[in-house]
């Protein structure tokens, strides 16, 4: 009894803070401001009220329902819908990281450029093919690092992540108060209520996927439900606190961006270099030169490296660690003496290399390539969130079978409606997000659209091939 009480020591504020560090980042503010300008303030309010809050609480119920499961989403699907769909969920969770892995070395290069040169000129000095070749070399190097299991790098990454988190909050505080403390002039003039109201047109709709991408990943906090004291009350309280904290940071951060960058004339490379521009301007406001920007660039470099190494290794081991031989060939699961899944790493390398080099055939500018890959992530990554809502809908249908300690909505029809809404909204965001955010029907727009349509189908479709290969191997 004493042991059980000792295990459940997390309070609602612990849950809120742990979740906040996991879910939120300064890049979310910059990327969505680059897409929408100050209109994003309205978008944040909508997303947090009608999507993120129910999403987080749904994760809480699923984590409580399957408190002994170690596979996350795939465990939830396995218990509710069988091993076949559980395999597809696990495959989706892994394969959507491929565009993420292809984009991370780019982010490392950009951060290094700002840390060393104090500006964003590094990616302008070389051709796209040369830069993407260097990106591929970086990826191969960090794949080797991941295979060595360097724990010290993860510790450095954690410290860097905390530093970035603190600096993100510092940015909001210093930028919002700058007009009162310094003589800085607000870049966006004539701000009225109409400044924040979006024009609901096709251009606006195509940017929703980036908002969904920004607030996703709450399923990572599900293991903490059953470590929480009085989870039926404290966990949802922590989640609501999380939603308020993220909403405040998103809204104030967006307002701060509006003070620095004219909402009606957003720089074309803001998505690529905006984080560094922001800290550079902040240093100018307070007569600190490039100090804040360099500190942030160094912390971001280390954080991106750690995130890349972790994302190469962890999702793959989740997929292969508890692999069912009916769905995944044994050859793919083969490991070397250090426990590295060699063939799994090779498959990752092939897919990432294609995604790094193929776009250079039709995208001739590094800034556009970076933005394209980031937008592709906003289309592909939320596909894994769909399985969360599928699992929730299944749990609601099987309500008599499961008796979790925490239940989000006890009214079955209402719970089903919320689950379907979250699933439909995520799917809608993914579908509309495939359209490139640039002048339509140009050669590059068509090329990007083709890649945006083909990539999710190819990546998820590969998952349908492996069960056939496994069946063939097992028959021998």
UniProtKB/Swiss-Prot annotation:
Regions that span the bilayer: 10-30, 39-59, 81-101, 126-146, 155-175, 196-216, 241-261, 292-312, 344-364, 376-396, 415-435, 449-469
Stretches in topological domain Periplasmic: 31-38, 102-125, 176-195, 262-291, 365-375, 436-448
Keywords: Cell inner membrane, Cell membrane, Membrane, Transmembrane, Transmembrane helix, Transport
Side of membrane Cytoplasmic, spans: 1-9, 60-80, 147-154, 217-240, 313-343, 397-414, 470-476
InterPro entries noted in UniProt: AA/rel_permease1, APC_superfamily
Similarity-based family: Belongs to the amino acid-polyamine-organocation (APC) superfamily.
Record GO cellular component, one term: plasma membrane
GO molecular function: transmembrane transporter activity
Bilayer topology term: Multi-pass membrane protein
Keyword Cytoplasm: no
Gene: ycaM
Subcellular localization, as worded in the UniProt entry: Cell inner membrane
Keyword Cell membrane part of the UniProt annotation: yes
Record-given protein name: Inner membrane transporter YcaM
Source organism per UniProt: Escherichia coli (strain K12)
